[in-house]
Amino acid sequence: MTSPRPPVNPETTADLGTTTDPGTTADPRVSLLFDSREKPVLEFANQAGAVAAACHQMAIRFHQGGKLVVFGVGGPSTDAQHVAVEFVHPVIVGKRALPAISLTSDVATVTGVAATSGMAAIFSHQLRYLATPADIALGISTDGNCASVLSGLLTARELGMLTIALVGGGGGAIAACPAVDHLLISSSADPRIVKELQVTTYHVLWELVHVFFEQPGVLAPGVVA
């Protein structure tokens, strides 16, 4: 037999976050926090067609033997590693692993290139020696003005790679670059919100690539193994 549970003491549970003060949800700062995310999320949803188009082209490249090459500076450098592992080691059991690398993982190479050729060359240099025309370049930038990412995308275009950019704010110089095949913008000036949306974006990219792989005839006759 189990013992009866002791009565709840509101004074102690409040400190544990188990009660809600109605006054806190009415605080305009709380509303502002959520409202600031509503418009960017809706604008992202309106890019569904653009996201699907990018994923279809990614799936075609993977099907033809290409790999995904991801890069970004600062916070986006960890996103690049996150994206790569999502494809190489899917979190969902049964999904096929797909080849992907992050150009931010090799610290020795990144710092070596930066020391001799400058930060702007850290991705373009690696792409010239690690990528092929069959591959996919995915550049991530919070504000769209990262010189290293822009240079990487330009080099990827020269190599004949499929180019995709995830950018924030108004898109910056990367959005204006003709070397980008697929541009996905997280429309917010707040880098925290941009980060949240970009994580969602590349999770959707991963999921839709697999959707295309699972549809017979979408990529080519007999594509589904």
Regions from the PLM with identified roles:
Residues 1-45:
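Generic N-terminal amphipathic, Lys/Arg-enriched alpha-helix
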Residues 104, 141, 167, 183-191:
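Short beta->alpha connector loops at strand-helix junctions that form conserved
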Residues 57-131:
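Glycine-rich, small/polar surface segments that engage phosphate groups of diverse ligands
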Residues 43-64:
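A short, well-structured juxtamembrane/interface segment
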Residues 153-160:
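Surface-exposed amphipathic alpha-helices with a cationic face
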Residues 76-81, 145-152:
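Short glycine/serine/threonine-rich phosphate/pyrophosphate-binding segments
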Residues 191-224:
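A charged, well-structured terminal subsegment
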Residues 166-180:
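Short, glycine/polar-rich helix-capping loops at beta-to-alpha or helix-loop-helix junctions
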